[in-house]
Amino acid sequence: MAENFGKVIQISGPAVDVQFSETTLPEIYTALRVVSEGFDVPTPINVVLEIQQHLGEGRVRCVAMEPTEGMVRGMKAIDMGGPISVPVGRGTLGRVMNVIGEPVDQLGPIMVEKRNPIHRQAPAFDEQATTAEMFETGIKVIDLIQPFLKGGKIGLFGGAGVGKTVVIQELINNVAKQHGGFSVFGGVGERTREGNDLWLEFTEAGVITPGDPSKSKAALVYGQMTEPPGARLRVALTALTVAEYFRDEEGTDTLLFIDNIFRFTQAGSEVSTLLGRMPSAVGYQPNLATEMGELQERITSTKRGSVTSVQAIYVPADDLTDPAPATTFAHLDATTVLSRALTEIGIYPAVDPLGSTSRILDPRIVGQEHYDVAQGVKGILQQYKDLQDIIAILGIDELSEDQKLTVSRARKIQRFLSQPFHVAEQFTGFPGRYVKIADTVRSFREILQGKHDEIPEQAFYMKGTIDEVHEAAEKMKANA
């Protein structure tokens, strides 16, 4: 096929207009590469654009995936023959790439046999797995209170420093060791410093081994705050495309992390304004629900494997009715809320069991026993929360015997919801624990039944199963 060329005729920041012949007009979402060949410019130009609109008379309006500084009218735009394509496969593990699939970790080219387009159809109805199945994470508080749906979408809410990254690292570690699966991290409009910190932490924790895909469990795809809005809008699709390959071609259960899904919406709003679309409510793009749906509907379980996504969600001005978070909520199967109040008393992971929810905490999916134990745990923690004002004003001695027992069990449950993580061993000094769901349900059932009322609450802190609590209690007795 002969190469198809166009010419740059207008540049408005990240929006670039290109003139083609009417007979060779490329399709919407086709990638173009603008080069400075034949132009005397200080820095050579090699910028990828994506066609967003056909303006008529052979003109197309594109959005740049890289900065357009130095680009001038008249430069050649090469039709790449299809949408942006990115490397997929095991060669991406342990590597950091950008929105167009180029490595940014200075470890040389990404060695893969295949590249896939970032724009793809969601799996058809007949390809999707129809059974609702729980995804075991090995983290007690998540598995018990807000179980993840295999192939589902989970919202992770939390401010700075409450442990979002550590929860993400542990999930990546557990999915690799227990499920033999892979993880893909999509940094959407995040701070460059945070991306660098995550890369270093993953390396130290052994989640990735730079330059050795066989020893790495995660691929990283970054589009930082400094990138043009086009890159921030499309980087989530790049990360999803990498994850889809592991689901469809390797048949694995894959984890996809998106941090932050709000910035995907924010970038879409910027692009929409650049393209001259009429804004809708609160200034967001009119196609907000469509853009979100196109991304979220591709995250699902098929008969071959699953992509389970954990999405960090920023809520502007803590307003949950804002169109950006409200549109995201419509797609979520579970919400995990990290609480600063729990970090202040040293409970890690700092997941708020009363603020977190899951669609599959249902006796028909997780079983009657799991459901009853989870509701019992939430009930006793709620009673403890209701009694805290009385305790603060009058003291614990003013409570009835039943209330004192409730407080005692609630404090044990609260401490037992803490858990040592494999990826945090060097900080906590506790060896990491992966707790199977059967052990989690059994342990909490026994606490609710009062079988461990005589054990001091200190013995429950940073333990895996109830058997470890017994061992700690025996040691405490022996040392007393």
From Swiss-Prot:
One of its GO terms (cellular component) is proton-transporting ATP synthase complex. Keywords: ATP synthesis, ATP-binding, Cell inner membrane, Cell membrane, CF(1), Hydrogen ion transport, Ion transport, Membrane, Nucleotide-binding, Translocase, Transport. PROSITE patterns: ATPASE_ALPHA_BETA (PS00152). InterPro entries: AAA+_ATPase, ATP-synt_VA_C, ATP_synth_F1_bsu, ATPase_a/bsu_AS, ATPase_alpha/beta_chains, ATPase_F1/V1/A1_a/bsu_N, ATPase_F1/V1/A1_a/bsu_N_sf, ATPase_F1/V1/A1_a/bsu_nucl-bd. Its EC number is 7.1.2.2. It is an enzyme of class 7 (translocase). The keyword Translocase applies. It comes from the Bacteria. ATP binds at residues 158-165. The keyword ATP-binding applies. It catalyses: ATP + H2O + 4 H(+)(in) = ADP + phosphate + 5 H(+)(out). GO terms for molecular function: ATP binding; ATP hydrolysis activity; proton-transporting ATP synthase activity, rotational mechanism. It is found in: Cell inner membrane. It holds the Pfam family ATP-synt_ab. Transmembrane segments: none annotated. It is a peripheral membrane protein. Produces ATP from ADP in the presence of a proton gradient across the membrane. The catalytic sites are hosted primarily by the beta subunits. Belongs to the ATPase alpha/beta chains family. F-type ATPases have 2 components, CF(1) - the catalytic core - and CF(0) - the membrane proton channel. CF(1) has five subunits: alpha(3), beta(3), gamma(1), delta(1), epsilon(1). CF(0) has three main subunits: a(1), b(2) and c(9-12). The alpha and beta chains form an alternating ring which encloses part of the gamma chain. CF(1) is attached to CF(0) by a central stalk formed by the gamma and epsilon chains, while a peripheral stalk is formed by the delta and b chains. This is ATP synthase subunit beta. The gene is atpD.
